[in-house]
């Protein structure tokens, strides 16, 4: 019975000592993997940031091109309300009070001369 206890105690001590070494080794391996994972995450984050900046620059460029090409009209077209004191009707149009169908609007409209 003593030999069984001694054998069990010896196996237990060996398992604990070897297990502890494995635990320390496992901890070091985990730290290395964590550091590698962090560097990979930093790389992926930088790559994503670059792509987003490129996309933002492209969108801003398209917006500026669109605003350059689209000019606001500086005159008012036919049948559009205008101000009697400050008429901005296009050439060939005059700001007049409406006749017949538009009398109830109490506003001036651009009409052909």
UniProtKB/Swiss-Prot annotation:
Q: Could you give the domain comment from the record?
A: The presence of a 'disulfide through disulfide knot' structurally defines this protein as a knottin.
Q: Which residues form a coiled coil?
A: none
Q: Where in the cell is it found?
A: Secreted
Supply the Pfam families for this chain.
Toxin_22
Biological function: Probable ion channel inhibitor.
Q: List the disulfide bonds.
A: 75-90, 82-95, 89-110
Q: Name one GO cellular component term.
A: extracellular region
Transcription regulation as a keyword? no
The UniProt entry's sequence similarity note says: Belongs to the neurotoxin 14 (magi-1) family. 01 (HNTX-16) subfamily.
Q: By what name is this protein known?
A: U11-theraphotoxin-Hhn1a
Which lineage is the organism of this entry classified under, starting from the top rank? Eukaryota, Metazoa, Ecdysozoa, Arthropoda, Chelicerata
Superkingdom field: Eukaryota
Q: Hey, what tissues is this thing expressed in?
A: Expressed by the venom gland.
| Keywords assigned | Disulfide bond, Ion channel impairing toxin, Knottin, Secreted, Signal, Toxin
Positions of the pro-segment in this chain: 22-74
Report the leader peptide range: 1-21
Name one molecular function that GO assigns to this entry. toxin activity
């Amino acid at each position: 019975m003593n030999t069984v206890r001694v054998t069990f105690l010896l196996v237990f001590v060996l398992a604990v000592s070897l297990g502890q070494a494995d635990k320390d080794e496992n901890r070091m391996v985990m730290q290395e993997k964590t550091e590698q994972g962090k560097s990979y995450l930093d790389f992926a984050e930088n790559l994503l940031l670059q792509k987003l900046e490129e996309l933002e620059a492209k969108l801003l460029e398209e917006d500026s091109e669109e605003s350059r090409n689209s000019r606001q009209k500086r005159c008012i077209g036919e049948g559009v309300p205008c101000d009697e004191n400050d008429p901005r009707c296009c050439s060939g149009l005059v700001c007049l009070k409406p006749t017949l169908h538009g009398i109830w609007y109490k506003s001036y409209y651009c009409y052909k001369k």
